[in-house]
């Protein structure tokens, strides 16, 4: 009982940090202060997206990744993908039960599928590692490897959000209405061909090729490569190259590396990511307070999916993978895998709704509720996870 209480105190400290920094962002967004208004949040969000997050992911991943560690972490991309797939299934159940308006289906599905694999673990892991007598051993090595796990998790989450969730929300937010075939097109389809069979065969081959070309062009227009290859994704790729190629690693990474100033500079810039992202969350919560129009049943459905059913699924998957020897016995690694199922929705969903122009205010309401209750969920579940893996 005493050990469980100690774990509860350990897991509650990072949540208090999140609440304090979030309250600063909330205060700065008030009309009377107006230091973090709509435009300021937009510009700060761009700085986080293009500068802070890539620097953070690149520096942490390059520092911790090696061939051996990458082999050990092979299950993490699979685990992150499973959080998205299971979340999507739970989101679809929420949609079926609560019957929201059609233009909000993509938002609800996205909130259940995409978790905040960025700044939440980035705050929780270092805070947990710093605690004396924690379940993860030496604080310095805990933070080094823990941040490497989080950086890979953040990179994979970014890829899945901008490939899977982005297109899922786009399809559900903009369902095209199929036009019925015209009389002329039906008439043309029944015309008797007046050309030879050989010419007809050639025309059919040409028609098939043209159809394939049209589909490829249509696919390239629908899939936005800029969103897939986001700055964080590119930074993760560069970090993997540096970490895995030994000569490059010795040149840049380490206390005796000739170009270690590059690593130190990128790390220094990346350290601004966590406070900036957390203050943006605080500013966005104020917007949620001023919004309305979201069905309470849909909000409750998202909360149950994200904070009850998804973490329970995570326990079954991660512990099952451990029993099957798919995951190593390292407690910190298992804790990060479990934590991926218990985080609130990704803040990038707000950016996606802005791109589509639908569900912006409703997204703010969902974020208000989910991040307000995250203080409870991110205390209770990590306590249980630490007890489970210790």
UniProtKB/Swiss-Prot annotation:
Residues 36-43, 98-107, 166-227, 287-297, 353-364 are cytoplasmic. The lineage of its organism: Eukaryota, Viridiplantae, Streptophyta, Embryophyta, Tracheophyta. One of its GO terms (cellular component) is mitochondrion. The chain crosses the membrane at residues 15-35, 44-61, 77-97, 108-128, 145-165, 228-248, 266-286, 298-318, 332-352, 365-385. Its main location: endoplasmic reticulum. It is a multi-pass membrane protein. It is found in: Endoplasmic reticulum membrane. This is Protein PIN-LIKES 3. It comes from Arabidopsis thaliana (Mouse-ear cress). GO terms for biological process: auxin-activated signaling pathway; endoplasmic reticulum to cytosol auxin transport; response to auxin. Induction: Up-regulated by auxin application. Keywords: Auxin signaling pathway, Endoplasmic reticulum, Membrane, Transmembrane, Transmembrane helix, Transport. The keyword Phosphoprotein does not apply. Pfam families: Mem_trans. Residues 1-14, 62-76, 129-144, 249-265, 319-331, 386-390 are lumenal.
